Amino acid sequence: MRARLILSSLLLASLAGCGGGSDFADLQSYMDEVRARPKGTIEPLPKFQPYEAFTYSAASLRSPFQPPVKIDLTVRQKGNKVIKPDETRVKQFLEGFNIETFEMVGTLSNAQGTFALVKGAGGVHRVRVGDYLGRNDGKVVGISEGKIDVIEIVPDGEGNWLERPRSLTLKERS
């Protein structure tokens, strides 16, 4: 019973705070004062220049990381119609890969001769003089302890063929 009395008195006291007193005159006067103040001006948005798309046009130029190649057309090596790849020859496995993917890793010598070990094309492969290496009909013509000499047959751009010497050198471990 006593709890009911306390609860009822608290309820009545809280309802008395919600009475109909409409004494908001000071709030209303402040709001009128704020509305009467002069309005500020907002600066207009700045004019933006339209975006111009950039097109990279140096893709066909020489890479800055490669040394410049001077081509003198008068001194340029001319191709020969006698030199041409043997189309009837059966291609070897290592001819299916670019020669740049191969790296010389060592040599082997036994009763059968000297072999070079090249790393690339998914493993380490053994090559000897007379084998072919790379996509340009590169024939191994010499093997020494430090390098493999290869002669490639490449087109000269005028319907003839050139023999281009290349070599794979043994990379020293550092």
UniProtKB/Swiss-Prot annotation:
It comes from the Bacteria. The gene is pilP. Inner membrane component of the type IV (T4S) secretion system that plays a role in surface and host cell adhesion, colonization, biofilm maturation, virulence, and twitching, a form of surface-associated motility. PilN/PilO heterodimers form the foundation of the inner-membrane PilM/PilN/PilO/PilP complex which plays an essential role in the assembly of a functional T4 pilus. PilP connects PilO to the secretin PilQ. In turn, the PilM/PilN/PilO/PilP/PilQ complex facilitates transit of the pilus through the periplasm and clamps the pilus in the cell envelope. A lipid is attached at C18 (N-palmitoyl cysteine). This is Type IV pilus inner membrane component PilP. GO terms for cellular component: plasma membrane; type IV pilus. The lineage of its organism: Bacteria, Pseudomonadati, Pseudomonadota, Gammaproteobacteria, Pseudomonadales. It is found in: Cell inner membrane. GO terms for biological process: type IV pilus assembly; type IV pilus-dependent motility. Interacts with PilO, PilN and PilM. Interacts (via C-terminus) with the outer membrane secretin PilQ. Gene3D superfamilies: 2.30.30.830. Keywords: Cell inner membrane, Cell membrane, Lipoprotein, Membrane, Palmitate, Signal.
